[in-house]
Amino acid sequence: MPRLPLLLLLLWGTGSHGFPAATSETQEQDVETVKKYLENYYNLNSNGKKVERQRNGGLITEKLKQMQKFFGLRVTGKPDAETLNVMKQPRCGVPDVAPFVLTPGKSCWENTNLTYRIENYTPDLSRADVDQAIEKAFQLWSNVTPLTFTKVSEGQADIMISFVRGDHRDNSPFDGPGGNLAHAFQPGAGIGGDAHFDDDEWWTSNFQDYNLYRVAAHEFGHSLGLAHSTDIGALMYPSYTFSGDVQLSQDDIDGIQAIYGPSQNPTQPVGPQTPEVCDSKLTFDAITTIRGEVMFFKDRFYMRTNPLYPEVELNFISVFWPQLPNGLQAAYEVADRDEVRFFKGNKYWAVKGQDVLRGYPRDIYRSFGFPRTVKSIDAAVSEEDTGKTYFFVANKCWRYDEYKQSMDAGYPKMIAEDFPGIGNKVDAVFQKGGFFYFFHGRRQYKFDPQTKRILTLLKANSWFNCRKN
């Protein structure tokens, strides 16, 4: 999620562990945000009373630490800007630390052939679109388990699905647009397994507002007995993000199969895994600078570093650019145009800030003059001082003049001619401080383009402030 500016005036005083008196309308709103969030999702019980400065301070601090640990934030017990940012994101209404229990018994269905019924429909989508979204969401889970799901049109089903607003008499009222999007109950009789969607939201079948398929797939995980996951790449992560291709992560698959076992398919599906930024084996698909920051890309994720923040930000590419595909293969910044270009296959996209420019994607043949034998770009970097962009394809490099908008004569060359010592394959590259940083596998080479010498050999994730690397 794009970072907010640093909150210079924290809600916590230096020596205080409770809420201070709010000194502005914004602070008062933030105090209320923290209070409601901890009550709803971390079992903070204020009994409807105003949270006092000292009496409940220790409990509030502990609940905040619990929340920060769950989301992988700095564990301070203080509502800093990063913590408030997470609290303000739209999310599932099921608590993170306490089970959403209304029915006694085990958190699983004894019967593997389940029924569902859509009691009513949102006006935001056609009935056919709603039916398709719900069916696809159940199919994600049936693909990896012995479970089957059959739609019924009347009577009581195992999983009842409804679109409701506000207080809908289940002790878990919705809160209007944004915030709490939906919730579902663990398996069981009565309301057990049922899923409720807030009809004050705008439900869609694309990346805008809230994608029904994405939210339904998450809620049905609860209907089947899963709790929230701390893995940001998991479908069962509590905060909402539309990642383009909705899929179960390996964490989701492991969780649901621990309850019901694997599917009966001869070939078991394998889900994507979330990168561990301090994994010494970490490799990258693409890297680029963007407005002074460095962004690393892996599968459907980006990792973002900023000299003002010690932590690495990890999230879906779609958080910044929902129109870009996953699995980007190359990227580079044209700083004087405030533009970044992303490549996948023979297509590329130009972005400015968080906006994909109109008319993209385009193909690399007409725009850059590559021959049709080039099917994709491995890596790219633009040299700020000269306006020359280097493209790396297999063991060759091409040089493109950004001012003339044409390839330079004499190219392609073997990589070793212009960049001796870095090997015959480049996975990713970027320029910073006048140096090129080349990546291949787990290795990183700091290269001086003036002397054409390697200065330092590093591990690929050396930019991430890992204690052990």
From Swiss-Prot:
GO terms of molecular function: metalloendopeptidase activity; peptidase activity; zinc ion binding
Cofactor annotation comment: Binds 4 Ca(2+) ions per subunit. Binds 2 Zn(2+) ions per subunit.
One GO BP annotation of this record: cellular response to UV-A
Predominant location: secreted
Residues that carry a glycan: 120
GO cellular component: extracellular matrix; extracellular region
Residue ranges of the propeptide: 19-99
Modification after translation, per record: Tyrosine phosphorylated in platelets by PKDCC/VLK.
List of residues binding Zn(2+) 1: 168, 170, 183, 196
Main EC class the enzyme belongs to: hydrolase
Binding site for Ca(2+) 3: 175-176, 178, 180, 198, 201
Residues at which Ca(2+) 2 binds: 158, 190, 192, 194
EC annotation from Swiss-Prot or TrEMBL: 3.4.24.7
List of residues binding Ca(2+) 4: 285, 329, 378, 427
Cofactor(s) this protein requires: Ca(2+); Zn(2+)
PROSITE patterns attached to this UniProt entry: CYSTEINE_SWITCH, HEMOPEXIN, HEMOPEXIN_2, ZINC_PROTEASE
Record-listed Phosphothreonine modification sites: 274
Domains: entry comment: The conserved cysteine present in the cysteine-switch motif binds the catalytic zinc ion, thus inhibiting the enzyme. The dissociation of the cysteine from the zinc ion upon the activation-peptide release activates the enzyme.
Family: Belongs to the peptidase M10A family.
Job of this protein: Cleaves collagens of types I, II, and III at one site in the helical domain. Also cleaves collagens of types VII and X.
Protein name: Interstitial collagenase
